[in-house]
Amino acid sequence: MMSEPGRIPLWLVALVAGTGVLVVVGLFFYGSYVGVGSSL
């Protein structure tokens, strides 16, 4: 997979974006789960 120098590969952008989304969603569900658990 060749790309011109100075350009970020698309797969790297997708990987970082996907990881970021998973982390945000995971933190959201973890935070809501912990909040519900502590409120009970």
Swiss-Prot record:
The keyword Ribosomal protein does not apply. It is found in: Cellular thylakoid membrane. GO terms for biological process: photosynthesis. It is a single-pass membrane protein. It holds the Pfam family PsbJ. Keywords: Membrane, Photosynthesis, Photosystem II, Reaction center, Thylakoid, Transmembrane, Transmembrane helix. One of its GO terms (cellular component) is photosystem II reaction center. The chain crosses the membrane at residues 8-28. Belongs to the PsbJ family. PSII is composed of 1 copy each of membrane proteins PsbA, PsbB, PsbC, PsbD, PsbE, PsbF, PsbH, PsbI, PsbJ, PsbK, PsbL, PsbM, PsbT, PsbX, PsbY, PsbZ, Psb30/Ycf12, peripheral proteins PsbO, CyanoQ (PsbQ), PsbU, PsbV and a large number of cofactors. It forms dimeric complexes. PANTHER family: PHOTOSYSTEM II REACTION CENTER PROTEIN J. One of the components of the core complex of photosystem II (PSII). PSII is a light-driven water:plastoquinone oxidoreductase that uses light energy to abstract electrons from H(2)O, generating O(2) and a proton gradient subsequently used for ATP formation. It consists of a core antenna complex that captures photons, and an electron transfer chain that converts photonic excitation into a charge separation. This is Photosystem II reaction center protein J. It comes from Trichodesmium erythraeum (strain IMS101). The lineage of its organism: Bacteria, Bacillati, Cyanobacteriota, Cyanophyceae, Oscillatoriophycideae.
